[in-house]
Amino acid sequence: MFSLGVQSRLFTRRALFSGFRFNSTTTTTTTASQPRLTWVDYFQLKKQNNRINTIAGVFTGLGGAFITLSYLGNIEIDVEKPIMGFDPLMVMGGAVILGGLVGFLVGPFIGSSIFRLTNRAQLKQFELKNTEFLSRLRIKRPDPSSQSFSNPIPDYYGEKIYSLKDYKQWLRDCNAFRRKSKEFL
């Protein structure tokens, strides 16, 4: 009897495969090696992402204007002949400005790829925090149907929230908006 009990305990599935890890399971050491992203770190990364996108937009805008200017500078144009009824220099100036605006709009795509490359280690946690933050905004956001000129809705998408202090102020502004919209209806 005793030997049967020992054998049954030795040859159980758990005892046989306790040293093995299956592909469907994960180890606890991989999750413990990466520290969790705090809200303060998330807001710092969000601010860094916005700054990189803005700087990239400025540089690509200047680059787009320069490329448009260099292209239009090589075209031979009769200065006295109007283009679609407008002065040619005005059309060329408008084209340079349009090239700069298109370059500025391309900038955030380049900036976001730069941000992803520089913060590759924290990117997954940043995106998880970002979805959690946006879901919190969606829950706490007031109904915009009652906005007016005297009572505008506060930062609907939360684009100006870069710290916990800003988030708390946004919540206060949302509560003030709700209170004003209920009182004056």
Curated annotation (Swiss-Prot):
Its main location: mitochondrion. It comes from Candida albicans (strain SC5314 / ATCC MYA-2876) (Yeast). It is found in: Mitochondrion inner membrane. Component of the PAM complex, at least composed of mtHsp70 (SSC1), MGE1, TIM44, PAM16, PAM17 and PAM18. It is a multi-pass membrane protein. Coiled coil: none annotated. Residues 1-52 form a transit peptide. This is Presequence translocated-associated motor subunit PAM17, mitochondrial. Disulfide bonds: none annotated. One of its GO terms (cellular component) is plasma membrane. One of its GO terms (biological process) is protein import into mitochondrial matrix. Component of the PAM complex, a complex required for the translocation of transit peptide-containing proteins from the inner membrane into the mitochondrial matrix in an ATP-dependent manner. Belongs to the PAM17 family. Keywords: Membrane, Mitochondrion, Mitochondrion inner membrane, Protein transport, Transit peptide, Translocation, Transmembrane, Transmembrane helix, Transport. It comes from the Eukaryota.
